[in-house]
From Swiss-Prot:
Signal peptide: none annotated. This is DNA polymerase III subunit delta. It is an enzyme of class 2 (transferase). It catalyses: DNA(n) + a 2'-deoxyribonucleoside 5'-triphosphate = DNA(n+1) + diphosphate. Transmembrane segments: none annotated. The gene is holA. DNA polymerase III contains a core (composed of alpha, epsilon and theta chains) that associates with a tau subunit. This core dimerizes to form the POLIII' complex. PolIII' associates with the gamma complex (composed of gamma, delta, delta', psi and chi chains) and with the beta chain to form the complete DNA polymerase III complex. DNA polymerase III is a complex, multichain enzyme responsible for most of the replicative synthesis in bacteria. This DNA polymerase also exhibits 3' to 5' exonuclease activity. The delta subunit seems to interact with the gamma subunit to transfer the beta subunit on the DNA. Its EC number is 2.7.7.7. One of its GO terms (molecular function) is DNA binding. Belongs to the DNA polymerase HolA subunit family. Keywords: DNA replication, DNA-directed DNA polymerase, Nucleotidyltransferase, Transferase. GO terms for biological process: DNA-templated DNA replication. Pfam families: DNA_pol3_delt_C (PF14840), DNA_pol3_delta (PF06144).
Length: 344
């Protein structure tokens, strides 16, 4: 089975349409764009009907299989898109295998699955897919990892005709990590705002800051530089957007551990003294901290002590326990109090 990424899809389609596409992943933007692109090309080749089914225990497989056999005899070419559940029961495997075995050239099959669990590739239905090789394509629609996101953003800006420098790309990655849909919208807005199509840090941050939708990363940035009022305002926005407190807690925890790693002492320290900044550039490089985030960490390092950090981490644990026990405004009140403490 041939495996590609969404950004390789246009090149693949230029060489011809496959019989079966397996979209694996959970990123809403990549799944939507990938399926839309496949369907647009298929429409041009006569596949003018589409049947989308969310597969569950109520799915009528007998009717589905019968309709596939009828297509081409009585009906026009059709795209069949199946959203599969994560749990591949024995019955689901059997039905999939039977469906795949009756496919013909007038049916274009698109399968969507959140993840390919260990062992799926050994299941009979998956093996049966390979009979259509090389006309079976697996497309990875997982959200790019932190390491791969800069490359993805660079390719996306280039495809849009935008000229983004490294700092602009880094800021886009940081601000919209795990939210490609918001990233796409930000790029579209930047394209409209700047006719010269050039993107730098200042232009990107202006769009990020003006966004009516706050992100946990904006809250983190405000905390690092000690802007308590801004941090509390963002926190209220996140609460209004129904962001889960646990997401904020885990994001903050990760940044605090990064601070500890950056300032790892080489000798005994006094916990009430400010965090050490010796060899800080070396540590920034070792941990691959983006250039535009280094001043933020420096601001926090020059303001905080180990004792304060440990107290903050302990309070994070207390708030997380509270968040898991009950859903109340008290969690948000404690997060606001913690924000002030970090900014002092």
């Amino acid at each position: 089975m041939n495996r590609i990424f969404p950004e390789q899809l246009n090149h693949h389609l230029a060489q011809g349409l496959a019989r079966v596409y397996l979209l694996q992943g959970q990123d809403p933007l990549l799944l939507s764009e990938t399926e839309d692109t496949i369907c647009q090309v298929a429409n041009l080749q006569g596949f003018d009907e589409k049947n989308t089914i969310q597969v569950d225990s109520q799915t009528d497989w007998a009717q589905l299989i019968e309709s596939c056999q009828s297509i081409g005899l009585f009906f026009s070419k059709q795209i069949l898109s199946l959203n599969l559940p994560e749990n591949f029961t024995a019955l689901l495997q059997k039905n999939l295998q039977e469906l795949i075995s009756v496919l013909h050239k007038d049916v274009l099959l698109i399968l969507q699955v959140a993840k390919l669990a260990k062992g799926i590739e050994k299941q009979t239905w998956f093996i049966t897919l390979n009979q259509y090789e090389p006309n079976t394509i697996l497309i990875n629609c997982q959200t790019p990892t932190v390491e791969n996101l800069p490359r993805w953003v660079k390719n996306r800006t280039k495809a849009m005709g935008l000229d983004a420098d490294n700092e602009a790309i880094q800021q886009l990655c940081y601000s919209y990590e795990n939210n490609l849909l918001a990233l796409k919208q930000a790029l579209q807005l930047l394209d409209l705002l700047y006719p010269d199509h050039k993107l730098n840090y200042n232009r990107v941050i202006s769009v990020v800051e003006q966004s009516s939708i706050f992100t946990p990363f904006q809250w983190i940035d405000a905390l690092l530089v000690g802007k308590a009022n801004r941090a509390k305002r963002i926190l209220k926005g996140l609460q209004a957007e129904d962001v889960q407190p646990v997401i904020l807690l885990r994001t903050l925890q990760r940044e605090l551990f990064t601070l500890l790693e950056l300032t790892k002492p080489q000798q005994r320290i006094v916990t009430t003294e400010k965090l050490p900044i010796q060899q800080i550039k070396t540590e920034f490089d070792r941990l691959k901290i983006w250039q535009n985030r280094r001043p933020l960490f420096l601001s926090a390092i020059q303001r905080l002590t180990y004792q304060t950090l440990y107290e903050i981490i302990q309070e994070l644990a207390n708030i997380e326990r509270l968040a898991k026990q009950e859903f109340s405004d008290e969690v948000w009140i404690k997060l606001a109090d913690l924000s002030v403490k970090i900014c002092l």
